[in-house]
Regions:
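Catalytic-domain carbohydrate-binding cleft regions of carbohydrate-active enzymes
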Residues: 1-150, 155-156, 193-197, 201-206
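Accessory, solvent-exposed terminal regions and/or long lumenal/extracellular loops of proteins
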Residues: 150-242
Length: 242
């Protein structure tokens, strides 16, 4: 149950989120790694709960994922980037072989040892923010919590994340499986001001979004109405942008 939950959490932040299985020749018990089957086999409903949450997160991230995957297909730059690749001038970063960048904005630090509840994470130069809790981290090594059912993911300062969120406006909320519309297109912006060109896959066009240091958003070539939410360091005002 622990390995399954760790695997599906990390898979949400990889190019392909998919579970595989093989048969033993005996259909009872089934070897299928569907979350409902795993929950039944292991007698642990958390398998289903963890999968549901991270499957929803995956769909929430789709505007960001599509944009970053499109960048990879056009440039050859990998979607998952080792710390050594992403930060070539940082010798310490290269020592953290299990951490990686997922696209240009997200740092992922999966737990890889059985029973881990905390994890030492190395943050390169700058300020980083917890994707799920907004906590700020300065450069260096920090010990972070990683209980089962969670995954440490951090956002680089100055980033802008295009997201498709559900009614709650939070990561992990269901938006279904449709890719022909957005339920709530939302840009999460992080302190430092930045610019991000994202691909609007619903309307088939690229748009540049800029967030100034004061939190004001400027959009060029935008079709869909969207919310902006300013994240990090208590910077949580929100407003509408069209």
């Amino acid at each position: 149950a622990e390995l399954y939950q760790r695997a599906v959490a990390q898979a949400a932040f990889s190019p392909v989120m998919q579970v595989h299985s093989e048969t033993s020749g005996d259909p009872n018990p089934s070897q299928a790694r569907t979350p409902w089957n795993m929950a039944e086999r292991k007698g642990d409903s958390a398998c289903l709960d963890t999968y549901r949450f991270f499957a929803n997160v995956r769909m929430n991230l789709l505007p960001y994922l599509y944009t970053e995957a499109r960048h990879s297909s056009r440039t050859g730059e990998p979607l998952m980037r080792s710390m050594a690749y992403a930060f070539p001038g940082d010798e310490t970063a290269a020592e953290y072989e299990f951490q990686y960048m997922f696209g240009g904005s997200l740092l992922v630090a999966p737990a890889v040892e059985m029973g881990e509840e905390t994890l030492d994470v190395y943050f390169p130069e700058g300020t980083w923010y917890g994707l799920f809790d907004g906590k700020a981290y300065t450069a260096g090594i920090h010990t972070v919590d990683c209980p089962l059912g969670t995954l440490p993911v951090f956002v680089k300062s100055g980033s802008i994340l295009p997201l498709n969120l559900g009614e709650s406006g939070k990561l992990g909320g269901s938006v279904g499986n449709a890719t022909d519309s957005y339920q709530n297109l939302t840009f999460w912006a992080y302190p430092g001001g930045g610019e991000y060109s994202w691909y609007d896959y619903v309307n088939g066009k690229e748009e540049t979004v800029k967030v100034l240091a004061d939190g004001k958003m400027q959009r060029a070539n935008g079709t869909e109405s969207a919310d902006i939410v300013l994240q990090g360091n208590g910077w949580r005002n929100s407003g509408q942008a069209g």
